[in-house]
C-alpha cells in the first residue's frame, strides 16, 4: 500500500514524464456527404474536411491524440482506429471508449452530433482509420495513420545492408515514409451494394476501380484482354465460363456454396456485376529524391473486399514492417495484401532517374482489374516507360518467371517476441455461411447483426443479455492467455470458402499454427503433439489481421494475452462479410472491467457533463440545416469561447488533470478496499 507522500511523488513524476515525453495532437474533423469523382465517375461520397481519403494522422509514439468528429452527414457514423491499442498510461488502463465501434464502445454518432476520441499513439508504425458503422467504408470514410518510433527502437536495417551509408539512409527514410493507401471503389452506395446482395442472395465481389491514395480510373479493356490476363488457377476453376466485361468472375460454388442454384443474379443492378463504362480520373504520383538513397513506401490495405498484389517496376522491395511491426526483412518483387493489412517496404533509389510504374492489381481471386501510380525520381525523365513483373490481372509477366513473392507464412517479428508456450483458455470458432451466400457466422452459432447493441454498448453493461450471449460473446480474464481456433469449411458440402481477413480490435495476436482439415483436438497442446510441423511457438507471425485458407477445410490458431480490458470486436475485414454478420464480441478482462470517465458516459460522447453541444439534425445530399457548434472542454468542465483558442498546453493540462483524477480515484478505492479487509 502506498503512503500519501509516496503517492504524491509518483504522481509528480508521472506528470513530469508525460510533459516531456509526448505531445498532444489535436484534430478537428467535419465529416460530410457530398459529390466526388475519385475515378472520374461522379457519385455522392464521404469526405473529411473536404478531403478523400481523409487527413493523415502523423505523430510520434506515445503522443496523446484527440480527434473531434462532427457528423454533418444524413446518416450515422463512427471512426475506428485500426491497429492502435487504445492503451493509456493511467494505471495501465486502456481507452476502450475511443475504439469507435457502435454497440461495443459507443453509440452511433448521429446526424449533427459530435464525438471526441482520445487515445495514445501506440503502437508505432503504419495504421489507418475507417468508419465502423454499417458498410460505409465503401463510401469513402478512411485515411492513413503513421506513428514514428522512438529513436532508440531496435531496427532491422543491418539485415538489409551492412553499409553504414545505407543504414543511415534507411534510418532517415523510415521517419518520413511515402504512405500509399490502396482501396476499391464502386459507383454504388454501400446500402445499394448490400441491397443487391440481399435481393439476389449472392455474394458479390465486383468493383469499378482500384484507387491509390484516392485516385484512379475506370478501365474497360476488351474482354479478350481480360480473359488473357485471368490466372491459370481461375481459368481452370471457371471453365467453360469466363470473366465478363468488367473483369468480374461468374458466380460459382466456391464463392456461393450450395446457394448458387437458388440465387437471383438477374436482380443485380446494371453496372454493379457487369456493364463496364470507362471513366478517366487521375493517377497518383509519388516523388522521391535519389539523393536520399533509400525510400520507404508504406502500403495500407484499405480495400473493402479486393485481394491486392503490388509491385514497383525495376525495383526490388525489402518488406520490413507488417501491420505496423518490424519483421526480419524479406527482399521481394511482389506483395499480396488483403483488406486491413499494411506492408512497409524499403526501395533503393539507385536506378536511372525517371518515372517508374507502381502496379496495383487484384491478385486474381475476385476480378481482373488494375490500378497504376507513378514513382517519380526528382529531376528525372517524366513520362518514361518501365518494365513490370505483373500484368493487368496481377499475374507474373516475366519471361523466365523469376518473380519473388513475399512469403506470408514466414514473417518472424524483429526483434523476436514469442508468446507463452501454453494458454489458459481455448475457444473454437466455426466460421461459415449462414442460410445464404452473403450472410455469415463467425462463431457457428448465429450472425452478429451489424446494429446489435448499437444503443446499448457492451462497455456500459457487460452483464446485459447481449453481453451474456455465449453463442456470440467470449469472456476472458485479465492477464490470461487465450487461444482462438478459427475453422473454415466445416459444413458438409461446403469445404471451400473465400479467404476471410480476420481482425481483432485492440492490438496484435500471434498466429501459432495452421493446418488443413477439421479441428478435432481438445487442446492446442494435443494438436501440437499430433502435428508439430504445423505450429511455430518461437517465431510466429505477430499482426492484427489474419487470412484463412481458400484451399478447402482448414484451421488457424491465434494466441494472445489479455492486457487491455474492454469490449472488442473480432470480425472479418471484408466489409460485406462483416455487414453480413461475420463477427463476435470478445469481452477481455471481464474481472477488471474499466472505470468509465464522466466525459465518456453513455450519452456524453467525450464531453464533460453539462458541456454537450446542442443536438442538431442533418440535411440531405451533403447539406445540414445548421452548423454544429465546435466546443472545446476546459479543465473545469465549462465551455471555452472558441475551439481555436485552446492551446496545446491548455489541452495537455486538461489531459493530465483528467488522468490525475482517475489515478486518485483508483488509489482511494484501493485504500478503502484494503482498510475494509
From Swiss-Prot:
Positions contributing to Cu cation 4 binding:
503
Residue ranges annotated for the Plastocyanin-like domain, each copy included: 31-150, 179-379, 469-588
Q: Where is this region: Disordered?
A: 629-651
Effects seen without this gene: Impairs autofusarin biosynthesis and leads to a yellow pigmentation via accumulation of the intermediate rubrofusarin.
Q: Does the keyword field hold Signal?
A: yes
The alphabetical list of record keywords is: Copper, Glycoprotein, Metal-binding, Oxidoreductase, Repeat, Secreted, Signal
The record's principal subcellular location, in a coarse class, is: secreted
Pathway(s) it belongs to: Pigment biosynthesis
Give the location in the cell: Secreted; Secreted, Extracellular space
Its EC number(s) = 1.-.-.-
**Amino acids binding Cu cation 1:** 80
Residues annotated as signal peptide:
1-23
Q: Which InterPro entries does this entry report, sorted A to Z?
A: Cu-oxidase-like_N, Cu-oxidase_2nd, Cu-oxidase_C, Cu-oxidase_fam, Cu_oxidase_CS, Cu_oxidase_Cu_BS, Cupredoxin
- Source taxon at top rank: Eukaryota
Pfam families referenced in this protein's UniProt entry, alphabetically: Cu-oxidase, Cu-oxidase_2, Cu-oxidase_3
GO molecular function list: copper ion binding; oxidoreductase activity
Give the family from UniProt.
Answer: Belongs to the multicopper oxidase family.
Oligomeric and partner information: Might be part of an extracellular enzyme complex composed of GIP1, aurF, aurO and aurS.
Any idea what job this protein has? Multicopper oxidase; part of the gene cluster that mediates the biosynthesis of aurofusarin, a red mycelium pigment which is acting as a mycotoxin. The first step is performed by the polyketide synthase which condenses one acetyl-CoA and 6 malonyl-CoA units to form the first intermediate, the cyclic heptaketide and yellow pigment YWA1. The C2 hydroxyl group in the pyrone ring of YWA1 is probably formed during ring closure by an aldol-type cyclization reaction.
Q: What is this protein called?
A: Multicopper oxidase GIP1
Species name for this entry? Gibberella zeae (strain ATCC MYA-4620 / CBS 123657 / FGSC 9075 / NRRL 31084 / PH-1) (Wheat head blight fungus)
Amino acid at each position: 500500500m502506498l503512503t500519501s507522500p509516496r503517492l504524491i511523488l509518483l504522481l509528480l513524476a508521472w506528470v513530469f514524464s508525460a510533459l516531456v515525453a509526448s505531445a498532444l495532437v489535436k484534430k478537428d474533423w467535419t465529416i460530410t456527404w457530398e459529390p466526388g469523382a475519385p475515378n472520374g465517375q461522379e457519385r455522392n461520397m464521404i469526405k473529411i474536411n473536404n478531403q478523400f481519403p481523409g487527413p493523415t494522422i502523423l505523430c510520434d509514439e506515445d503522443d496523446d491524440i484527440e480527434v473531434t468528429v462532427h457528423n454533418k452527414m444524413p446518416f450515422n457514423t463512427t471512426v475506428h482506429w485500426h491497429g492502435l491499442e487504445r492503451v493509456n498510461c493511467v494505471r495501465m488502463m486502456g481507452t476502450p471508449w475511443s475504439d469507435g465501434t457502435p454497440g461495443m464502445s459507443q453509440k452511433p454518432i448521429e446526424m449533427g452530433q459530435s464525438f471526441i476520441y482520445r487515445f495514445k499513439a501506440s503502437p508505432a508504425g503504419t495504421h489507418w482509420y475507417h468508419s465502423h458503422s454499417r458498410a460505409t467504408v465503401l463510401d469513402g470514410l478512411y485515411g492513413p495513420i503513421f506513428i514514428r518510433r522512438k529513436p532508440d527502437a531496435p531496427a532491422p536495417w543491418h539485415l538489409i545492408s551492412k553499409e553504414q551509408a545505407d543504414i543511415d539512409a534507411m534510418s532517415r527514410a523510415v521517419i518520413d515514409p511515402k504512405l500509399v493507401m490502396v482501396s476499391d471503389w464502386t459507383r454504388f452506395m454501400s446500402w445499394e451494394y448490400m441491397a443487391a446482395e440481399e435481393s439476389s442472395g449472392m455474394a458479390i465481389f465486383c468493383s469499378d476501380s482500384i484507387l491509390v491514395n484516392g485516385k484512379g480510373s475506370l478501365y474497360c479493356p476488351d474482354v479478350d484482354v481480360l480473359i488473357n490476363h485471368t490466372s491459370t488457377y481461375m481459368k481452370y476453376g471457371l471453365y467453360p465460363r469466363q470473366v465478363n466485361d468488367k473483369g468480374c468472375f461468374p458466380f460459382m460454388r466456391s464463392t456461393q456454396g450450395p446457394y448458387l442454384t437458388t440465387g437471383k443474379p438477374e436482380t443485380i443492378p446494371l453496372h454493379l456485376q457487369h456493364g463496364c463504362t470507362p471513366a478517366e480520373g487521375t493517377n497518383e504520383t509519388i516523388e522521391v529524391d535519389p539523393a536520399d538513397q533509400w525510400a520507404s513506401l508504406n502500403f495500407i490495405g484499405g480495400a473493402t473486399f479486393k485481394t491486392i498484389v503490388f509491385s514497383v517496376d525495376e525495383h526490388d522491395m525489402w518488406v520490413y514492417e507488417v501491420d505496423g511491426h518490424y519483421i526480419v526483412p524479406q527482399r521481394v518483387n511482389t506483395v499480396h495484401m488483403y483488406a486491413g493489412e499494411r506492408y512497409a517496404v524499403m526501395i533503393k533509389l539507385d536506378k536511372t532517374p525517371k518515372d517508374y510504374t507502381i502496379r496495383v492489381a487484384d491478385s486474381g481471386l475476385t476480378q481482373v482489374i488494375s490500378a497504376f501510380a507513378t514513382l517519380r525520381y526528382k529531376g528525372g525523365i517524366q513520362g518514361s516507360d518501365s518494365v513490370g513483373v505483373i500484368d493487368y490481372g496481377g499475374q507474373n509477366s516475366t519471361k523466365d518467371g523469376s518473380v519473388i513473392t513475399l512469403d506470408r507464412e514466414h514473417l518472424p517479428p524483429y526483434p523476436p517476441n514469442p508468446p507463452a508456450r501454453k494458454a489458459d483458455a481455448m475457444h473454437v470458432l466455426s466460421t461459415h455461411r449462414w442460410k445464404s451466400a452473403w450472410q455469415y457466422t463467425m462463431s457457428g452459432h448465429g450472425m452478429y447483426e451489424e446494429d446489435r447493441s448499437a444503443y446499448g454498448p457492451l462497455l456500459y453493461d457487460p452483464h446485459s443479455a447481449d453481453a451474456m450471449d455465449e453463442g456470440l460473446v467470449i469472456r476472458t480474464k485479465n492477464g490470461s492467455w487465450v487461444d482462438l481456433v478459427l475453422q473454415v469449411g466445416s459444413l458438409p458440402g461446403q469445404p471451400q470458402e473465400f479467404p476471410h481477413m480476420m481482425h481483432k480490435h485492440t492490438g496484435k495476436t500471434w498466429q501459432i499454427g495452421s493446418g488443413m482439415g477439421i479441428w478435432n483436438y481438445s487442446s492446442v497442446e494435443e494438436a501440437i503433439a499430433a502435428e508439430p510441423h504445423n505450429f511455430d511457438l518461437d517465431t510466429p507471425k505477430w499482426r492484427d489481421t489474419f487470412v484463412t485458407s481458400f484451399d478447402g477445410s482448414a484451421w488457424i490458431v491465434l494466441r494472445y494475452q489479455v492486457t487491455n480490458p474492454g469490449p472488442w470486436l473480432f470480425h472479418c475485414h471484408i466489409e460485406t462479410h462483416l455487414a453480413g454478420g461475420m463477427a463476435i464480441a470478445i469481452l477481455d478482462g471481464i474481472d477488471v472491467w474499466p472505470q468509465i470517465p464522466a466525459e465518456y458516459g453513455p450519452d456524453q460522447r467525450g464531453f464533460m457533463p453539462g458541456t454537450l453541444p446542442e443536438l442538431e439534425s442533418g440535411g440531405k445530399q451533403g447539406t445540414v440545416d445548421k452548423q454544429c457548434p465546435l466546443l472545446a472542454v476546459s479543465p473545469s468542465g465549462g465551455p471555452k469561447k472558441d475551439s481555436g483558442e485552446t492551446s496545446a498546453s491548455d489541452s495537455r493540462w486538461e489531459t493530465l488533470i483528467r488522468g490525475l483524477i482517475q489515478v486518485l480515484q483508483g488509489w482511494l478505492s484501493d485504500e478503502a478496499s484494503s482498510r475494509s479487509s
